[in-house]
Amino acid sequence: MSAKSPEVSANAITVRRARTSDVPALRRLLDAYSRDRILLDKATVTLYEDIQEFWVAERADNADNAEVVGCGALHVMWEDLAEVRTLAVNPALKGAGVGHRLLGKLLETARLLGVSRVFCLTFEVDFFTKHGFVEIGETPVDPDVYAELLRSYDEGVAEFLGLERVKPNTLGNSRMLLHL
């Protein structure tokens, strides 16, 4: 196997819980995606507030300096439902298995929390389909849960619910769901 093989690259990656010291690296990683409107722009304060939801992928060089090359978050929305959010990989490493490793860790976390369904809103339909997600049309919650979720101030929850005020953020995205 050559040194440029995606599997070799993925094996050099460590996935771990994010720390507050990772926020500047997350900011740099996410800025390109938000500029291109692939991901919602998140205020830096929101990254700090939500850091406990994040996992990061880092790559160490020969001098043991680690670089954050990917991230993803799992946001619990209800007792049986969570959302994969802010899944991003350094564009130079796309296709190297970094996103796969991060998503695997997020799904493992969902299982440990007792969540049975995981939702995402994405442009990367092929990636999520390969991991068992299926496209859905409507918001997959009962009316009582929907009414309770309306009380959330979280923009991601508003997107999940398809609220009119966030429609511009979601144009072209696909709603996808995975049953664990």
List where the protein language model places each region.
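A generic "binding-loop/recognition-motif" signal
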Residues: 22, 80, 123-124
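A short, internal acetyl-CoA/4′-phosphopantetheine-binding micro-motif in the GNAT/acyltransferase core
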Residues: 87-94, 123
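Conserved active-site alpha-helix within GNAT-family acetyltransferase domains
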Residues: 112, 116, 122-152
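Short amphipathic alpha-helix that is part of the acyltransferase structural core
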Residues: 2-40, 58, 64-67, 172-180
